[in-house]
Structure formats: structure tokens, C-alpha cells
Amino acid sequence: MLRTCDITHIKNNYEAIIWKGERDCSTISTKYPNSAIFYKKRFIMLTPELGFAHSYNQQVKPLYTFCEKQRHLKNRKPLTILPSLSHKLQEMKFLPASDKSFESQYTEFLESFKILYREPLFLQIDGFIKDFRKWIKGEFNDFGDTRKIQLEPFQKNILIHVIFFIAVTKLPALANRVINYLTHVFDIEFVNESTLNTLKQKTNVFLVPRRHGKTWFIVPIISFLLKNIEGISIGYVAHQKHVSHFVMKEVEFKCRRMFPEKTITCLDNVITIDHQNIKSTALFASCYNTHQSIRGQSFNLLIVDESHFIKKDAFSTILGFLPQASTKILFISSTNSGNHSTSFLMKLNNSPFEMLSVVSYVCEDHAHMLNERGNATACSCYRLHKPKFISINAEVKKTANLFLEGAFIHEIMGGATCNVINDVLITEQGQTEFEFFRYSTINKNLIPFLGKDLYVYLDPAYTGNRRASGTGIAAIGTYLDQYIVYGMEHYFLESLMTSSDTAIAECAAHMILSILDLHPFFTEVKIIIEGNSNQASAVKIACIIKENITANKSIQVTFFHTPDQNQIAQPFYLLGKEKKLAVEFFISNFNSGNIKASQELISFTIKITYDPVEYALEQIRNIHQISVNNYITYSAKKQACSDDLIIAIIMAIYVCSGNSSASFREI
């Protein structure tokens, strides 16, 4: 017989164990925010953090996102608030609500909100995510290697697809709440309805180049699902028996090593982990397996590895799981091969359901270049990047094609049979972002993050012929890891009677002084004057620019110096073979959205009726490759359109990005 005090003590300890997950996961404030509201019921919303408030707060995305993140944080860090804001907040007084029923409504709402954090399956999903995070950090490694694991985007994509689908099918009543939690955990912002529908799909296909860890990544997914999700049934199908056997043994080994406290059995190609009331199982089979079949099974997750090489008879059996509402089928395979019978999944590219994800080193616009140009091994738009552990060069290409014609494009690069003859280097997305998304560089909130050095590149031209070259001038600064265009000029001499050196220098100085007037935070102006045409004129231009700036502004002015024939440093820059590297660097950053224009951009020589950014875009669109005897160079000249301005912008960004501070000196 137990005493009353003992019963109470045991009950409290039992409840503490049962709801431990709730205390770990839920950080919802239970303090009632008592404030009066004076609007109609249809305009009222109720949240744990704000209490009763006006529904327009749902449209204030930063506020709503902040509340959701705070809701799921396990260890809240103290927030830093500006003293002025804190003082103003303390001055605000809220009238208490006159209706006492509001507090009881809030309490009931909060209690219903906590249901998610008490749900056993939610705690299982949260445990899966915690274990995966520990594995990524290297905490499950017993051999002293604590290096973090860096996942590729396609691996993160697979992980998100798996856990989202399980959450939606296992907890349909709380699906939206679970999804809000998972978007926070995976740090996915701006998730729209279309993205969620894609994640909820029953079937997804991932085509990835070889040697990228497709099968390697499947092992921890199966292991942690078996350990955390009670009653889950997983199926794994490989194209060959030895592959499925290897994966099974890897899963068994990892489970026994990482979860020694669990009861793990491996019998008849099925791994089982015993939980308190139910078992979690994973079945491993191959399309040639006569002893273990997936027929008649019921899976929550079915993974089909190297799907392109699965026997057609076995494939029809796999497709039989499509009508099963609670089954997620993941097809994972090498990207492509030259044989149409082993590349049939590429047909899903035209599917309206967005079920196909393809990883490739080359985009569709430039796939043809790998065949046309002998040493080409990368996408010329430089939008797609290969991992550091993958080494691809001309020797790899030649060797692969010697063994098997077309093997490089199909087996290594992940390309598909492509008839596209487009050779566009600049993407539409990059053009649109450059044209419409511009920073206000006089905004006080942005200024602390802007670079304090202004780089000016000047490419002088000594002609008044507007059909020929003009003088291109570009002023560039930095914002974190991005580049901002502060000013641009495309100057043509009015006549050959004009003193060209003086006119060009005054044009550049006028632009620089205007930029400094608007942006007084600059501490140094670094000027690069191209001297390929006339070195003597370049030196004279440098002297005139310095005289003009120092007469009007108290700021340090330095020039890029190059040794002349007598090894004496002169204030000019000789453009050489680095032009190719500079253009490639520009294309990569432009297509990645790292180059922006200032809203307060300065330009005196481009017509008032013409937007300078649109003017620059016309030249940017003209950038194209020129291949002569397997040597690749770039040009933006087309018909009557010159490339002076864009070359100045490209070189200014290239010099700005490099470690060339030692080359800048005063004169």
C-alpha cells in the first residue's frame, strides 16, 4: 500500500517523464498579454505571443515570422533592443481588457496549441531531426573524427521530402502546424503553397551524377527513421542484389553502433528495431531478388536506388504502390546514360507535377558546348558549380570518351541528349534582378555594411567617332560579398580639337566628386587607368584627376601602379590575359545576383531620357564567347554597339575583388 504523499510524488515524476518532450520543444509564453482591443470580432486574431490583436498583423511578415521562430526555440537567447526603442516601449501603457472571458479564451487556445508538442509522433519527428543534426556535427563518430558533414543541396532536398511527407500522412489533423515547425527547423523561408504541394507529393525523382553520395546518404536516413519513428515501414530496392545487401549491412552496422540500447534484429533481409509497443522495419530487396519480394508489403517510404537500371518487370511492381495514400516513393538514380532504355526518367521533365529534380554540372543552354568544344568541361554561364571533391578537367574528358564515346557528357557531367543551340551567357533572372533590384546607398541603415573604398576603372579612348570606341568609366563599391555600381560614364570626345586627356580626366573627376557628395562615408578612392593605348596619356589623366579631386575633397586618392620598362612604377594598368578571368568572374557573380546598381547611380554622359542601368544591360546582353584554336576569349562588341562601358564595369569589379592593395599608391 502506498501513502498519499508517495502516490503524488510518483505521479509527478511519471508526468515529468511523459511530458519531457513538451518542455524541450515548447517555449510558448503562458503569460496572458492583457490588453484592451477596440475592433470587431472578424478583425481579431489570436496567437500565443501577441494574444488578441488585429488581424493585419498576419500581413506583417517579419513580425509573424519572428513570433513563429520564437515559438519553436528551445533555448532563447537574450534579444538586444536599442535603448531608444526600449525607452519608448516602456512608456507605452496598455489598458487591460474589460471582458474577463478573453483570458479564459486565451488559456483554452494556448492549451489547444500545446497539443502538437504533446503528440507522440511530433516528439518522434523532433527526435529524428535532433539525431540527424548530431550526425551532421560528427557526434555519432566513435573514432575521434568530429568533422562536420557538409550536405549537398540535393541531399537536403531528399531529407526534407521524406520528413515532410511522413509528418503530413501521420499527423493529418496537425499537418499545417507540423509544417510551420519543420520550415523553422530546416530554415526554409518564403515557402509558398506550390512548394508545399511539391513536398507533399507521393512520388519524387532525383537524378544525380555519379560519385555524389546518393546511396551513402540513404543509410543514415533509414537508420534514424527506424530509431525514432515508431511503427514505420521502409522499403529499399536496388538494381543489383549485392547493392541491397551492402546497404542493409551498413544500416545494421550503424544502428548497432549508434543505438546500442535498442533491440535490433536482422533476419531474411529485414532489419527490425523494437520499440515499447511496436516495431519499426526496413526491407531490402533487388529487382532480381527471388527470396524477398516487395509484393504484398505496405510501406511508408519506398526508396528505389539506381532507378534507371531497375528491371521493367520489377518497375511495374513498384508503380503498384502509387495508389497507396500513405506511401512515399523516392526514385534516385544517376542522371543519364546514352541509352534511351536507361534514361527514361528524363521524360518526367515535362510532368506538370514538378516531381523531377536533376543535378547537373551544365545547364540546358550550354550542354551542346561540351561536344562542340574539345576542352570545354564547365558551363560557360558559371551558374552551376561542382563540389570540391569532384575534379573534372580536359584529361578526364578525353580519357572517359576514349573508353566509351559520349561517356563524359552522359555518365560524368549528368547531361541529357540536348538539341539546344542557344549560347546565352547571361541569364534572364540575372538581367531582371540587376534592372529592378537596386540598393539605396544613402540609406542610413545600409551605410554601416557598405565598403569604404570606391574603385574607379577608366578605359580611355582618344576618338570622337561614336561608331568606334568611347571612354568607359565605372565606379564600384562593395556591400558584404556583393558589388554595387555607384557610377558609370560612356564618354566620346566632342571633336579631335579637344584636349582628349583633359576632357577624359575632367569627366571622370566630375563623376567621382558627385559620388562622394552623395556618399561621404568613402575614405579612399582607388583609381585604375588603363594604359594599353597610350601610357603617357594615362599618366597625364591620373595627374589631372588627382588635382581635381583633392582641390574639392579631403580624401585619400590612390592609383594602380605598374612598373615600366625601367622598373619605375607608373600610374596606369596594362590589361592582359586576366580579361578572360575577369569576364568569367563577372558572369558568375551577375548570374548569381551578386552585382547590383545603386538607386543613386551617377552618370552625366548617358542621355537623361535613358536609364543608365538599361544602357549597361544592352552591352551586358552582348557578351559572347569567341573560340579560336580551342582558346576561349570573350567580347561584347556586336555590329554598331561598343563594349567600353561593360569592360570598365567588369574590370572594376575584378580589381575590387582581388588582393591588389599593394599596387595602389599615391602620386
Swiss-Prot record:
Q: Can you tell me which residues form the catalytic site?
A: E306 (for atpase activity), D459 (for nuclease activity), E530 (for nuclease activity), D644 (for nuclease activity)
Name of a matching Pfam family: DNA_pack_N
Which coarse location class applies to the principal site listed for this UniProt protein?
A: host cell
The record's subcellular location field reads: Host nucleus
Q: Where is this motif: Walker A motif?
A: 208-215
List the record's Gene Ontology CC terms alphabetically: host cell nucleus
InterPro entries in alphabetical order: DNA_pack_C (IPR003498), DNA_pack_C_sf (IPR038435), DNA_pack_N (IPR003499), HSV_TRM3 (IPR033663), P-loop_NTPase (IPR027417)
Keyword annotations for this protein, in alphabetical order, are:
DNA-binding, Host nucleus, Hydrolase, Viral genome packaging, Viral release from host cell
An example GO biological process term is: chromosome organization
Domain of life assignment: Viruses
One of the record's GO molecular function terms: DNA binding
Q: Supply the EC number(s).
A: 3.1.-.-
Transmembrane segment boundaries: none
* Record motif Walker B motif, residues: 301-306
Q: What does this protein do?
A: Component of the molecular motor that translocates viral genomic DNA in empty capsid during DNA packaging. Forms a tripartite terminase complex together with TRM1 and TRM2 in the host cytoplasm. Once the complex reaches the host nucleus, it interacts with the capsid portal vertex. This portal forms a ring in which genomic DNA is translocated into the capsid. TRM3 carries an RNase H-like nuclease activity that plays an important role for the cleavage of concatemeric viral DNA into unit length genomes.
Q: How does it assemble?
A: Interacts with the terminase subunits TRM1 and TRM2. Interacts with portal protein.
Entry similarity comment = Belongs to the herpesviridae TRM3 protein family.
Put simply, this protein is called Tripartite terminase subunit 3
Task: State the taxonomy lineage.
Answer: Viruses, Duplodnaviria, Heunggongvirae, Peploviricota, Herviviricetes
